[in-house]
Amino acid sequence: MKVLHFGAGNIGRGFIGKLLADAGVEVVFADVNQQVLDALNQRHQYQVRVVGEQAQVETVRGVSAVHSGSDDVVALIASVDLVTAAVGPQILERIAPAIARGLVKRHDGGGTQPLNIIACENMVRGTSQLKQHVLNALEPRYHAWVDQHVGFVDSAVDRIVPPVEAGSDDPLAVTVESFSEWILDKTQFKGVPPALGGMELTDNLMAFMERKLFTLNTGHAITAYLGQLAGHQTIRDAILDPAVRQTVKGAMEESGAVLINRYGFDARKHAAYINKILQRFENPYLHDDVERVGRQPLRKLGAGDRLIKPLRGTLEYGLGDANLVTGIAAAMHYHSDQDPQAKEWAALLAEVGPQAALAKVSGLEEDSEVVAQVVNAYNAMQ
């Protein structure tokens, strides 16, 4: 089996590419970073530092790479068994034209073998969005063939992959946590889904996507925002602060109550899932900076993201939300000279004040009780 994987960054190499290669799949990475491409093609292997209770180094073998903008990518899409991507939500639209050209070549070559395409992004239904970009790049006469032969499979991914620490001169160096989860919507595959280790199939993907968003992503973000306010440098430092931990755990329990009401998750199993995530945040081998984790506050305070969406759920079901309110207030205090969204958020706050700024970004009613609660908590943190 041969896979073309867009994105040879840390997540591509440390998570999806590694999982595929470990399953015996031939992996060809596509990327624009020539230094990384050259290193992959010279070595055809790389090392991944996997950190859990201990740290160990594992070698990923049998890999190669091509430039994302090359004709090689088009030729590969015409012949491979699977296409995956871990490029970041904003980049999906950029890779769509190359995928479209590859599908045309596959069609024109008489290809009838099913091809499945999977975006492995930290977003809801990312592959469905990629599908729209690909269809937009294709002439309409190809659409029926694509519908028949190409599966666009949504997935939920979960693995903490922090940036490489300063001082490493190896372009392929990557560290990942031992925990990983890759859950795919089995109803969207064309043909028989591949049976690969580490790949889980479900017919209720939305439940698992929201479980991850409302628990890992919610908890990670609130740990970062409260951690920055408390003067902590890393996620580990922050979650070991009893005051931060209490609020983060409380927020995940509040969002968990929404999930239990909405999807019928088992309460005891979900409590264990929350505790597992808290342990992951404590990992001494992961030096995950709170400033990095908190980036893009405009997106993270958006209506469908990790802070506001669970809050809306508590309002829908009449559940407690005091810790989520505290976490959102902390997010409003986030600052970073490195993040354009943080600067944009600071300018909006200064221009219209916290109440109107939160309403504008989150979609919550400006005069609602919950916005007033968040603003009161925000002001109390001054």
Swiss-Prot record:
GO terms for cellular component: cytosol. Its EC number is 1.1.1.17. One of its GO terms (molecular function) is mannitol-1-phosphate 5-dehydrogenase activity. It comes from the Bacteria. Keywords: NAD, Oxidoreductase. It catalyses: D-mannitol 1-phosphate + NAD(+) = beta-D-fructose 6-phosphate + NADH + H(+). It is an enzyme of class 1 (oxidoreductase). GO terms for biological process: mannitol catabolic process. Pfam families: Mannitol_dh (PF01232), Mannitol_dh_C (PF08125). InterPro entries: 6-PGluconate_DH-like_C_sf (IPR008927), 6PGD_dom2 (IPR013328), Mannitol_1_phos_5_DH (IPR023028), Mannitol_DH (IPR000669), Mannitol_DH_C (IPR013118), Mannitol_DH_CS (IPR023027), Mannitol_DH_N (IPR013131), NAD(P)-bd_dom_sf (IPR036291). NAD(+) binds at V3, L4, H5, F6, G7, A8, G9, N10, I11, G12, R13, G14. NCBIfam families: PRK02318.1-2 (NF002646), PRK02318.1-3 (NF002647), PRK02318.2-2 (NF002650), PRK02318.2-5 (NF002652). Belongs to the mannitol dehydrogenase family. This is Mannitol-1-phosphate 5-dehydrogenase.
